[in-house]
Amino acid sequence: MYERGYSRLAVTGDSAGGNLALGLIKHLSQSSELAGSALAGGVAVSPVTDLTLSGESWATRGDADPLFTRAQVTDLVQAYLAGHAADDPAASPLFAELKGLAAFRVHVGSDEVLLSDSIRFVEKAFAAGVDARLEVWEGMIHGFLVSVGRLEGSNGGLHRLGEFLRERFVR
């Protein structure tokens, strides 16, 4: 897109797409041909940041999040990794070097199993000097943003996501 004349790009993704979005943000932020200026920022919603599935909320939120179970995710992770290590930074953004990333926001539900992964990822990025912020939506489970118009947290999350991207594009 940048080669076609677009001067500002944003990257967003939800769930596994959040994992891919964070990986792409890392790649674009460190790309010498983009010189860092083309990437306006990014948003990851309920991202899978740790494919080792070692975050504490897998245990503490498992019963509260019926849409995203450990058994279900374990099978998907194994298929995605295809024999590669779960802690490979190319697959698990939590284990990557995060210094120099473009500004991003992470939105996650307070009742989802990926809560601790999101917290750890944003804390690590912030410690590396990245403009990274976490928004935790009370009572929301995995995939809550797809319920826009039905859940207040979904409406608020989409609004905040849009605010951040508008702010980044105005610069």
State each model region's role:
Residues 1-171:
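Alpha/beta-hydrolase superfamily serine-hydrolase fold, recognizing
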